[in-house]
A protein has these predicted regions:
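Class I S-adenosyl-L-methionine
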Residues: 135-175
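Short strand-turn motif at the edge of the Rossmann-like AdoMet-binding core
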Residues: 82-83, 130-133
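S-adenosyl-L-methionine
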Residues: 1-49, 156-163, 172-175
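Short glycine-rich, flexible loops that bind phosphorylated cofactors or substrates
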Residues: 86-88, 136
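Conserved acidic E/D residue at the C-terminus of a beta-strand in Rossmann-like folds
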Residues: 47-53, 62
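A short acidic, Gly/Pro-enriched loop at the edge of an enzyme's catalytic core
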Residues: 64-80, 86
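Short glycine-dipeptide loop
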Residues: 31, 121-127
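A short glycine-rich, Lys/Arg-flanked "PGG" loop and its adjoining helix->strand segment in the class I
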Residues: 94-123
Length: 175
């Protein structure tokens, strides 16, 4: 496993931060199908989604509904850059006139996303998660941690933490 720490200025567009952009360039290939459930202005993934209809994305769904669109083991890679805090989740929903409920502001909101990502990724598929912690998808869902990138932004700004994980290949057939 690789652990790296590279300082960079913060940006509301996570994928434009240089060390993060460099990491993405190492993992994402044009021949693969990548999805992004929280694309905002990003065009890196093959199939994009953002709850906010003001962004030019392929879909404007709640992220959970977006992930549920895909068949089991059908996606090569997932970019998972959700709102980092429950307050940010609430702001995103309110910003597009959606009701903020107990369901959208509990930690189970993220767990449901992670369950769907685990289901749709192909064996050996990659999930790149962004946030303020390094939980990622996790070993308990059959993922292997390949890389952690810490991007400190200085002062009182929270670091951006990036985890890169691979869905373990399992062959359950005996013959």
């Amino acid at each position: 496993m690789v652990i790296d720490r590279i300082w960079s200025m913060p940006s509301k567009n996570t994928f434009t931060i240089k060390p993060i952009k460099d990491l993405l360039n190492r993992y994402i290939f044009p021949s693969q199908t990548w999805i992004d459930g929280f694309a905002n202005e990003s065009k890196i993934a093959t199939i994009t989604n953002d709850l906010n209809p003001e962004y030019d994305t392929d879909h404007h769904l709640d992220a959970l509904d977006f992930f549920k669109m895909f068949q089991d083991n059908s996606i090569d890679g997932v970019l998972y850059d959700p709102p980092y805090s429950l307050r940010q989740v609430s702001e995103c929903y309110k910003g597009v006139g959606k009701e903020v409920t107990m369901e959208t502001t509990q930690s189970s909101w993220r767990s449901r996303h992670i369950d769907e990502i685990s289901r749709i990724l192909k064996p050996n598929g990659i999930c790149i998660c962004f946030g303020w912690n390094s939980s990622g998808i996790g070993k308990e869902r059959g993922f292997k941690l390949l890389e952690i990138l810490l991007v400190p932004h200085g002062g009182s700004k929270n670091d951006t933490i990036v985890t890169v994980e691979s869905k373990a290949y399992t062959n359950l057939s005996l013959f």
